Design a protein with these regions (language model features):
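Phosphate-coordination loops involved in phosphoryl transfer and adenosine-cofactor binding
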Residues: 68, 141-144, 217, 226
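Rossmann-like dinucleotide-binding domain for NAD(H)/NADP(H)
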Residues: 93, 226-322
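Phosphate/diphosphate ligand-binding glycine-rich loop within oxidoreductases
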Residues: 45-124, 138
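Oxidoreductase and adenylate-handling cofactor-binding alpha/beta cores
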Residues: 106-125, 159-166, 296-310
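N-terminal glycine-/charge-rich "phosphate-binding" loop or analogous flexible N-terminal tail
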Residues: 1-47, 51-52, 165, 169, ...
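Rossmann-like adenosine-cofactor binding region
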Residues: 43, 56-61, 174-271
Length: 322
């Protein structure tokens, strides 16, 4: 079994790692982008554990891994070529954890909102440079938070907002808006009203072929110059180049993000990372010990179940049944 991309060698210290006792495990703490080198590295292994989307599992890679039988991971899998997995006889198992929010992601979203509204990174940098106050922040109480995506993380963030005295309004898919209304939530009348009326907008949507490029240049143009846009979900939910263009145009006035089109980025390869009206973090929304314990307990359970001949959470189950 190979575990990929454990950059800080964290997993061996988790309680759940003991579930792998009796299994020969190799943990890779670096990130390899060269397909030929990665294929050579992974060729001996029967099973892979993925660290979220840190490594893309492409058809080109899978075609060079004749021994591979299992890929175990958690949550959505846009980085895995499922068709190529099936063609190569590789079972993909992924616990979709329905009904369980990522409190780590929700808390990080709220941290970015707070940090941006109160200019915390800028104030800190200014102070460390030997200066005193450098500007005036904004309070959240009485302001409107627009949440795009009526799901588990969005609902958790809504709870934080309500505790801070914010007005919460929703938008999303037709089905999501319907669920929100049935639950007594405030839903914007139109998409344009949603973007126009909110002081802060945060996106909480899974990346699928249908949601790729969901947030457009037109949406950003509807936002006010004093508003904040937050994305801790996936960069590809935004139309390519649209956020940078929007920040340069001043609508929205600010943004806070945890996700990038290419990860990891090599500073300053992504111009968003150095934009003066943006604060950013290196995709750490899920990077807490507590979240790792939760996620990898599920991932390791899938390995054990496969080893026992009774795999769980199968995505391409047809190859197992056939």
């Amino acid at each position: 079994l190979a575990i990929l991309d454990d950059w800080f060698n964290t997993l061996r210290g988790l309680t759940c790692f003991s579930k792998l006792n009796g299994i020969e495990v190799t943990v890779f703490t670096d990130h390899e982008t060269d397909i030929a080198k990665l294929a050579k590295r992974l060729r001996p292994f029967d099973a892979l554990v993925l660290f979220r989307e840190r490594t893309a599992i492409t058809a080109e890679l899978l075609d060079q891994l004749p021994n591979l039988k299992l890929i175990s991971q958690r949550s959505v899998y846009p980085h895995v070529d499922v068709e190529a997995c099936s063609r190569n006889g590789v079972l993909l198992c992924s616990n979709m954890h329905s009904g369980t929010p990522s409190f780590a992601a929700a808390e990080h979203t709220w941290a970015l909102i707070m940090a941006s509204m109160r200019q915390i990174p800028q104030q800190m940098a200014n102070l460390q440079a030997g200066h005193w106050q450098m500007g005036v922040g904004k309070t959240l109480h009485g302001r409107r938070l627009g949440l795009y995506g009526y799901g588990r993380i969005g609902k958790t963030v809504a709870g934080y907002a309500e505790a801070f005295g914010m007005d919460v309004v929703w938008w999303g898919s037709e089905a999501g808006r319907k669920r929100a209304k049935l639950n007594g939530q405030k839903v914007a009348t139109t998409r344009s009203e949603f973007f126009e009326s909110a002081d802060v907008i945060s996106v909480h949507v899974r990346l699928t072929p249908e949601t790729r490029g969901l947030i457009t240049t037109t949406d950003f143009a509807s936002m006010r110059p004093d508003s904040l846009f937050v994305n801790t979900s996936r960069a590809a939910l935004i139309e390519p180049g649209a956020l940078l263009e929007a920040l340069n145009a001043g609508r929205p006035g600010r943004a806070a993000i945890d996700v990038f089109d290419q990860e990891p980025i090599i500073w300053p390869a992504d111009p968003l990372a150095t934009h003066p009206n943006l604060i950013c973090t290196p995709h750490i929304g899920f990077v807490t010990e507590d979240e790792f314990e939760l996620q990898f307990s599920d991932v390791f359970d899938q390995v054990i179940a496969f080893q026992a001949g009774a795999p769980i959470n199968m995505i391409n189950a047809q190859i197992w049944h056939s």
